[in-house]
Amino acid sequence: KVIKNELNLIKEKFSVPRRTKIIDAVLNYDIEETIQKESVVITITHKGYIKRGPLNRFKQQKRGGKGKSSIKTRDEDFVVQIFSVNSHTPVFFFSTQGLVYKLKAWKIPEGTSTSKGKTLFNILPLKNHQSISSIMPLPENELEWKKLQIVFATSSGKVRKNSLEDFINIQSTGKIAMKLDNDDKIIGVKICKDEQDIILSTKFGKCIRFMSKKLRIFKGRSSKGIKSIQLAENDSIISLSRSEEHTSE
């Protein structure tokens, strides 16, 4: 009873309307702002398994060391690409059917040094007949993309060069990167400078080399490209590479 009386006295003495309001509201924020920036290693296998791991997992060793396991592969699978980027780095995934997908590195599932990773079908909206032909890390600042050029090569020998700026806005479902004939597919995509050479290799062991600046920059993504090489019957392009700089030799 004493406590009750004291509380009533306090109520009478300090009976002031509340100055603040408590309301329901939706908190808007970018989840990426909560992701720590750190150096990570991305590993991809021939059968399409991918994973992310911290770079500090790989300690420096002296020359002649045994190295450290980075991934556990299944039978007849092997690592085809490994690169180190920032966790906020955008990464492009180009499918053989001409689509491009974009993921920030932190969205790639993290795995241990002994795990095989996750299949690309689990993290990208790929259809059953699709596979990824090229995986490309890009500058985090998209303003730098205007200065870069991207070269596509197909199995039939078509090539096309675009400004990387054409690929800034990519939906979660992907975007058409290059239109292809029904029997054609993308075999490689590279960032290339005018002072570099493009090198294409064929299934039958042929090779052609030409200057990147000889390719005009196409506007948009609707073109199928231009012919780069005269292929023999049943031959096809299997690899795209670039030289560090052009030489006349």
Where are these regions (language model features)?
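C-terminal interaction appendages of subunits in large macromolecular complexes
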Residues: K1-E244, S248
